Amino acid sequence: MKIITQNKKAHFEYFIEQKFVAGIKLQGSEVKSIRAGKCSINEAYITFRNGEVFILNMHIAKFDASSIFNHEETRTRKLLLNRSEIDKLMGAQTRDGMTIIPLTVELHEGLIKVVIALAKGKKLFDKRETIKERDIKREQQQSLKGKMR
């Protein structure tokens, strides 16, 4: 799987509970633009309508070589999941106070997939703890690197 774009703040702002790989319904110019790496999911979120899953605010830049049939950049796009996965996501979101966020957009065997996650928001002290752990890990790596020289 080739990662095209990722939501870098997701791991900092949320505890990731479970991941799902979903297909996405796109137009031709959107596929070409995503393959060129011109998409962003930093402000995207997942919602449900009539038992179906949709991603909102996913920004896909207009494809330059496309004619008048170009797509709208932040339109609502349908995600393709199995019924059991949709039921699991809907149940967890309503019951446990969890949210569903997009993590990455990937190219898998010629198909574009969106990895979404069932996540729980972090509090401020959790974020501080994450920063401390990251700093400690970085210092350990630097000290090991210094000893190897």
Curated annotation (Swiss-Prot):
Pfam families: SmpB. SUPFAM superfamilies: Small protein B (SmpB). One of its GO terms (molecular function) is RNA binding. GO terms for biological process: trans-translation. Belongs to the SmpB family. Keywords: Cytoplasm, RNA-binding. It comes from Acholeplasma laidlawii (strain PG-8A). This is SsrA-binding protein. It is found in: Cytoplasm. It comes from the Bacteria. HAMAP family: SmpB (MF_00023).
